[in-house]
From Swiss-Prot:
S-adenosyl-L-methionine binds at G47, G48, Y49, D64, F91, D109, Q116. This is Ribosomal RNA small subunit methyltransferase H. It comes from Rhizobium leguminosarum bv. trifolii (strain WSM2304). The lineage of its organism: Bacteria, Pseudomonadati, Pseudomonadota, Alphaproteobacteria, Hyphomicrobiales. SUPFAM superfamilies: Putative methyltransferase TM0872, insert domain (SSF81799), S-adenosyl-L-methionine-dependent methyltransferases (SSF53335). One of its GO terms (biological process) is rRNA base methylation. The keyword Cytoplasm applies. InterPro entries: RsmH, SAM-dep_MeTrfase_MraW_recog, SAM-dependent_MTases_sf. It is found in: Cytoplasm.
């Protein structure tokens, strides 16, 4: 499944975008903000969730790894008289900015923000020509670095696993051939090549470059690793009765959140080899339905909501468990950081 990261386009790479928080009513229902409560918004973005949480009377610690979002949010900080603390940080580091076991709620809205899609110079959209960057902050390798330097086998892994792209080998080999002549510099450079290699068919609902752009963005920003670390950090930071609410936009993210809550439900998992499994105390209990999606009415108003899924859990009295990345079963794509040396 490929998400539309914002606005009035069904293409995952761009289109006109509205700054509308997705599943806002459902998020507030699951999060239950109220006066006297301290909520951490791990993905401040344009401030949609934080604004609604503040309106309910709670105090907010809001994080964002994008310095542009932090700068844009200063007016909101000034308007709320100390009830909003805005921090430049990745949400995987939320434990550094919140009292351990002291939060009443954590909300995470995963993926690229509508503001980032709007800015062509950030390189997130194949519909807006700009530098092939895709970094949510200025640190680390860019999408151009990956496309121009990664081994073909590594490009195939990235496109196949993170983009669920069935044409990954064909696209990767075409990239290798083209970059020998001229390096990729812009989003249109890459999107144009993909269009030539895998032309759009009449039945296709998404642009041919959608899955590759998604894969590169996720890889460059280590989005799956960030999400997994944030879930573990939230488990330790929430007080008993605290609420963890996560909104995702594609199947890889949702799979991680689903697996986390399933594991933290504490149910023993024996097998024919080890029929008696150790019973574990649940660290989270379910809040409402296992998964909530947007109504047709919301999806019509905000197309980004069409692929959104919300999962939520209520923190129990049990001690937080150790972080274990092997729980999620995805390959260590971070090992590709050398990009072919």
């Amino acid at each position: 499944m490929v998400a539309n990261p914002g606005g009035g386009s069904t293409d995952a790479g761009g289109g006109p975008v509205r700054h509308i928080p997705v599943l806002l009513d459902e998020v507030l229902s699951a999060l239950a903000p109220a006066p006297g409560k301290l909520i951490l918004d791990g993905t401040f973005g344009a401030g949609g969730y934080s604004s609604a949480i503040l309106a309910a009377g709670a105090e907010v610690i809001a994080l964002d790894r994008d310095p542009t979002a932090i700068a844009s949010g200063q007016a909101m900080v000034a308007a709320h008289g100390g009830r909003l603390k805005l921090v430049h940080s990745q949400f995987s580091h939320l434990a550094d900015h919140a009292p351990q076991g002291g939060l009443d709620g954590v909300v995470l809205d995963i993926g690229v923000s509508s503001m980032q899609i709007d800015e062509a110079e950030r390189g997130f959209s194949f519909q807006k020509n700009g530098p092939l960057d895709m970094r949510m902050s200025a640190a680390g390798v860019s999408a151009a670095d990956v496309v121009n330097r990664a081994k073909v086998a590594d490009l195939i892994r990235i496109f196949h696993f993170l983009g669920e792209e069935s044409q990954a080998p064909r696209i990767a080999h075409a990239i290798e051939k083209r970059r020998e002549e001229k390096p990729f510099e812009t989003t249109r450079d890459l999107a144009g090549l993909i269009e030539l290699v895998t032309p759009r068919k009449m039945k296709d609902k998404i642009h041919p470059a959608t899955r590759v752009f998604q894969a590169l963005r996720i890889f460059v920003n280590d989005e799956l690793g960030e999400l997994a670390q944030a879930l573990f950090a939230a488990e330790a930071a929430l007080k008993p009765g605290g609420r963890l609410v996560v909104v995702t936009f594609h199947s890889l993210e949702d799979r991680i959140v689903k697996k986390f809550f399933s594991d933290r439900a504490g149910k023993a998992s024996g097998s024919r080899h080890l029929p008696v499994a150790h019973e574990r105390a649940a660290t989270f209990a379910a809040i409402g339905k296992p998964m909530v999606s947007a109504s047709e009415a919301e999806a019509e108003i905000n197309p980004r909501a069409r692929s959104a899924k919300l999962r939520a859990g209520l923190r129990t009295e049990a001690a937080a468990e150790a972080a274990d990345m092997s729980l999620f079963g995805f390959p260590n794509l971070a090992s590709l950081g050398k990009l072919g040396g």
